């Protein structure tokens, strides 16, 4: 079973992703440093949740960007 993240964590992650898209990677530790740098989080648990969801969100968005082109390539190969 996966974790369910609150609306606040999702909102913060989307804001970070939209503003600092170029700095975010698929590495958790790198994203944790980004969260420390740009978000004032007092709780270690919340910081880690934000960094974890940011990593997952990055992978999802990266997959969405590449999937339409892959489908077009598969269709053209079949023809």
From Swiss-Prot:
GO BP, one annotated term: translation
Keyword Cell cycle listed: no
Record InterPro entries: Ribosomal_eS17, Ribosomal_eS17_CS, Ribosomal_eS17_sf
Superkingdom, natural source: Archaea
Gene Ontology molecular function: any one: structural constituent of ribosome
Keywords (A to Z) from UniProt: Ribonucleoprotein, Ribosomal protein
Transmembrane segments: none
Annotated GO CC locations: cytosol; ribonucleoprotein complex; ribosome
Cystine connections: none
Coiled-coil region: none
SUPFAM superfamilies recorded: Rps17e-like
PROSITE patterns per the UniProt record, alphabetical: RIBOSOMAL_S17E
Family under the similarity heading: Belongs to the eukaryotic ribosomal protein eS17 family.
NCBIfam families from the UniProt entry: PRK01151.1
Record-given protein name: Small ribosomal subunit protein eS17
């Amino acid at each position: 079973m996966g974790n369910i993240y609150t609306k606040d964590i999702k909102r913060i992650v989307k804001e970070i992703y939209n503003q600092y898209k170029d700095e975010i990677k698929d590495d958790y530790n790198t994203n944790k440093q980004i969260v420390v740098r740009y978000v004032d989080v007092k709780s270690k648990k919340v910081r880690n949740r934000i960094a974890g969801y940011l990593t997952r969100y990055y992978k999802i968005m990266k997959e969405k960007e590449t999937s339409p082109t892959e489908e077009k390539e598969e269709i053209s190969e079949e023809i």
